[in-house]
């Protein structure tokens, strides 16, 4: 039977909202119950200690996840479903709301898309003239540098879907979001090519493990 301490995260969420909870408290709500000799709060802390972070837990594969005492295939399936629902929610939010009005949603969307990638992925969000999402495309994979990213391919795709604006994004698997000189050079080349076709590059976001670096917010566009 769960003790009062085990119920605290649920009560805290109802009183203060989910943002007020720590990682282990959120995980405890997801797990719901502990195992023999280990109440859910303790289990949650043990799981996070084992993986090292919430990020590592969420990006673990089935074998690694289910190898931890107290976790199993049911929780793995539920977690995968929750992650996918989050991605779809954010995408639907972006389809219905002008992106420029909600930059935090864009960051969250890109984090869910790219933060777990082990290789660099270059993604482009194609937007209409009201800055609503038309579609997203992963255009380039592998080491992202000037020779690997082709502005003409991006502009060709933008013209095909009648995009009026673009948001560029790529991840740094290292987790370090500071842009390199190559990142800045790529951005400038794409921006110059887009301007020739009267297409606006709104931002270039570098995605790390838990946050994003915005070129626009740092006056690099």
Curated annotation (Swiss-Prot):
Kindly give the SUPFAM superfamilies that the UniProt entry links to this protein.
Answer: RuvA domain 2-like
Q: What residues does the MPN domain cover?
A: 99-221
Q: Which UniProt keywords apply?
A: Hydrolase, Metal-binding, Metalloprotease, Protease, Zinc
Per the record, the similarity remark reads: Belongs to the UPF0758 family.
Q: Where is this motif: JAMM motif?
A: 170-183
Fetch the InterPro entries from UniProt: MPN, RadC_JAB, RuvA_2-like, UPF0758, UPF0758_CS, UPF0758_N
Binding of Zn(2+) occurs at: 170, 172, 183
Q: Please name one Pfam family that this protein belongs to.
A: UPF0758_N
- The lineage's top-level taxon is Bacteria
Q: Which Gene Ontology BP terms does the record give?
A: proteolysis
Q: Which Gene3D superfamilies match?
A: Cytidine Deaminase, domain 2
What protein name is recorded for this chain? UPF0758 protein CGSHiEE_07200
What is a GO molecular function of this protein? Answer: metallopeptidase activity
